[in-house]
Amino acid sequence: MHYARIVSNLHLGYDIIHMAEYVTLTTNRKAFHNYFLEEKYEAGIMLLGTEIKSLRSGRVNMGDAYVKPQRGELWLVNAHISAYECSGHTSHEPMRERKLLMHRKEIALLMSKVKEKGLTLIPVRIYLKNDIAKVELSLGRGKKLYDKRDTITKRDTERELEREVKYRNFRR
């Protein structure tokens, strides 16, 4: 996905369209199934060189990942970034905790919201924004089993309706 933003350039007398690239590397599909996601936030992530190379090749799994607030900092836990094949003997630990980078006021706000009953901070996706790795975080409330069943039945009925509409339009 590309989003364009116009940057005013007065000394040249015209506007330049600056393309900000957003390349999604991975999404946490389990998060959409297990949680009601509410607010979204963007955080940077501290990675080693071999980790960013593994990310770019798509060797990451965020199925059980969550964010742990600890001593005024946010840490990404249980995100598996596979070892880079070409790194030789100097590779990283795949399941290590990774520090998330945000402003202190944002961290304090998130920590106060996480202390509320039932809210968890969940990584939804990892993406590149102008070649810098970012994590999209979301506040989520856990779904009960009947909530999961309701969302599945709603999705199935919507899919059936779309199929019928498509079939009707095709027959005309």
Curated annotation (Swiss-Prot):
Alphabetized SUPFAM superfamilies for the sequence: Small protein B (SmpB) (SSF74982)
Recorded superkingdom: Bacteria
One GO biological process term: trans-translation
GO CC terms, sorted: cytosol
One family name in Pfam for this protein: SmpB
Cellular compartment(s): Cytoplasm
GO molecular function, one term: RNA binding
Entry-linked PROSITE patterns: SSRP (PS01317)
InterPro entries reported in the protein's UniProt record: SmpB, SsrA-bd_prot, SsrA-bd_prot_CS
Swiss-Prot/TrEMBL keywords: Cytoplasm, RNA-binding
Family annotation (HAMAP family): SmpB (MF_00023)
Homology family: Belongs to the SmpB family.
Function noted in UniProt: Required for rescue of stalled ribosomes mediated by trans-translation. Binds to transfer-messenger RNA (tmRNA), required for stable association of tmRNA with ribosomes. tmRNA and SmpB together mimic tRNA shape, replacing the anticodon stem-loop with SmpB. tmRNA is encoded by the ssrA gene; the 2 termini fold to resemble tRNA(Ala) and it encodes a 'tag peptide', a short internal open reading frame. During trans-translation Ala-aminoacylated tmRNA acts like a tRNA, entering the A-site of stalled ribosomes, displacing the stalled mRNA.
Protein's recorded name: SsrA-binding protein
